[in-house]
């Protein structure tokens, strides 16, 4: 029971930290990027390289927090499933959806960190093919980040399924308002994937992610951990009923 609570709280806190670090980067609270200029791809990368190096700690910690958060999601799925009977249909839903979501999400976030770190450690070798190196580096990073985005999208969809499954399984043990938060969180996770897939212009995708990852997911997870803490184990309830 204690492990379940800590996993739930870890999910909430880690996603909150990751979102807070995203906002630090967005509002230029750690470092300020240079003004945009009509430069080609190589010139643009060289112009922002100092900024990329300066913001790297925030970028890395941001994605690392989300990676750990996804790992906690996988653990939470296992812990929630363990509280259900072997014949409960939601047991397999929680095991597969939240478990796989945690793995895919963590792998995706670590891929983003690894792809960016290479470009931070060495922008180019200055061996006579600087332009070619930088262009190939940018495209390589884009390919890796594209694959990582799809892993995270899949994780978001599976997490939404898992959240609905948790709501169905534990609805009677949780406050009624948590049921609403569960559905809002699941819908929000699906919406972030849809908005990203259809390439909506503007900042809708960013702020939707902030809402979901920085507010809805933390509220859902922390509330779950706090409420289950106040409830007895299912075994204890069954024992009392038999007695």
Predicted regions and their residues:
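Hydrophobic, aromatic-enriched alpha-helical segments typical of multi-pass transmembrane helices
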Residues: 1-243
């Amino acid at each position: 029971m204690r492990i379940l609570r800590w996993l739930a709280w870890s999910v909430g806190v880690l996603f909150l930290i990751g979102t807070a670090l995203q906002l630090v980067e967005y509002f230029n609270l750690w470092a300020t990027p240079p003004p945009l200029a009509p430069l080609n791809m190589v010139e643009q990368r060289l112009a922002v390289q100092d900024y990329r190096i300066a913001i790297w700690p925030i970028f890395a910690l941001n994605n690392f927090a989300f990676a750990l958060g996804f790992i906690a999601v996988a653990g939470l799925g296992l812990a929630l499933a363990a509280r259900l009977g072997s014949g409960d249909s939601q047991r397999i839903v929680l095991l597969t959806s939240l478990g796989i979501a945690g793995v895919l999400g963590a792998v995706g976030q670590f891929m983003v960190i690894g792809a960016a770190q290479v470009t931070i450690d060495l922008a180019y070798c200055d061996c006579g093919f600087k332009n070619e190196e930088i262009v190939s580096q940018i495209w390589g990073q884009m390919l890796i980040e594209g694959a990582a985005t799809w892993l995270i999208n899949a994780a978001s969809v599976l997490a939404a399924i898992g959240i609905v499954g948790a709501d169905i399984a534990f609805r009677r043990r949780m406050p009624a308002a948590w049921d609403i938060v569960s559905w809002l969180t699941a819908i929000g996770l699906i919406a972030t994937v849809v908005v990203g897939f259809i390439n909506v212009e503007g900042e809708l995708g960013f702020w939707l992610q902030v809402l979901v990852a920085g507010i809805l997911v933390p509220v859902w997870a922390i509330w779950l951990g706090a409420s289950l803490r106040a409830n007895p184990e299912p075994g204890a309830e069954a024992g009392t009923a038999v007695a």
